[in-house]
A protein has these predicted regions:
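A preference for well-ordered globular domain cores
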Residues: 1-105
């Protein structure tokens, strides 16, 4: 577990007794949750289903599908960086950069 201890004198100590594999798994899970949350905030499940069924006009369906694909690709980019990390700090430093939301969603 990674712990941060802040002292009254302003000194900060970081304790990290996780293995690299544990740190990688923890970060991948966090980014997976962030990706899902980002998609669901932008395109709720009902919107995703309607787009998959083609209920909306084709341009909107395509924009929704492309946004979800962009989020998935960003997650996969991050996952690759995390799995290539050689230290816990390197794995923890990988951040998800949400793709821009297309107009018309």
């Amino acid at each position: 577990m990674k712990s941060i201890l802040a002292h009254i004198d302003g000194k900060i100590e970081v304790f990290d007794d996780r293995t690299l594999i544990e740190a990688q798994a923890e970060r991948i899970e966090l980014l997976r949750e962030m990706t899902t949350q980002n998609i669901n905030q932008t395109c709720p499940q009902s919107t995703q289903q309607n787009a998959a069924l083609g209920i909306y006009e084709p341009a909107r369906c395509e924009a929704i599908k492309n946004y979800i694909a962009a989020c998935r690709n960003e997650y996969l980019r991050c996952k690759g960086l995390i799995l290539a990390a050689t230290s816990n700090d390197e794995a923890d430093s990988v951040t998800f950069i949400a793709p821009p939301v297309p107009e018309g969603l």
